[in-house]
C-alpha cells in the first residue's frame, strides 16, 4: 500500500487502485487477492477449503444454538456475541478425533468446551451473581435443573446502578446439529426485590426428551429491573442482563 500525497485526497476505486482513509492517513492500494475459482479448485488451497468448511459448520451450529434461546438473547447478548460463539464452536469442531480435517463436526467434537460461555460480555453471570448454584443434567430422564443456595440479594448481586429488582431464568436445549432441529424449554422466577432478606433455596427445572442422543445444554441468566409506579423496566434495555451456558452434556 502507498500513502497519498498532494492537496486532493481521493476516495473509492479507480481502475485497479483503491483509495481510502485509515488511521494512518489517506492510503492507496492495488487490487489483488486470489479468485474464488482458484480457491475452490487449486490443490494448493486444500487447507483453505478445509478451514472454510469447518468454519461454516461452526457458524451454522452457533446459529442453531442461538435460535433455541432466541427469546432470551433479545435482552442478554452483546454485539459481538455471534462471532465469539462461532469461534468457540470452531474449537469444539477441532476436537473431533474421528473425522478427517475439513469433515470434522460438532457431534464428534467436544461440546463441553462451551461450558462457561457468556452471551453478554457487558453483564457476565460470573460477576453478576455470587450465590453458589449447582446445575445438573440427567440425560436418562431429560431433567435439567439449577439449584441456587439461599442468598441475600443486596449482597450477592452486582446490579446496575438504579436497579430495584431482579429475575432469574433458566433454559434447557436439546440440539441435533445434523438435522438442524432442537427442543428447548425455559423457566423463570417472578421479579424479586433486591433487598437484605435471605432468600429461600431456589430450584428451577426444565424437562426435555428422556434418553436423548443429542448434545444437551443448560443456561442460567439474570435480568435487572427498576420499579417505577408499579411498573418494572429493564435496566438500560437489558444491557447488563447476564446469560451463561452453565452445563453441557455432549453426545453419550
Language-model region placement:
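Short, low-complexity, polar/charged sequence segments that are solvent-exposed and flexible
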Residues: 38, 46-47, 81-83, 165-169, ...
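Charged linear interaction tracts used for macromolecular binding and regulation
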Residues: 93-237
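C-terminal interaction-tip segments
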Residues: 228-252
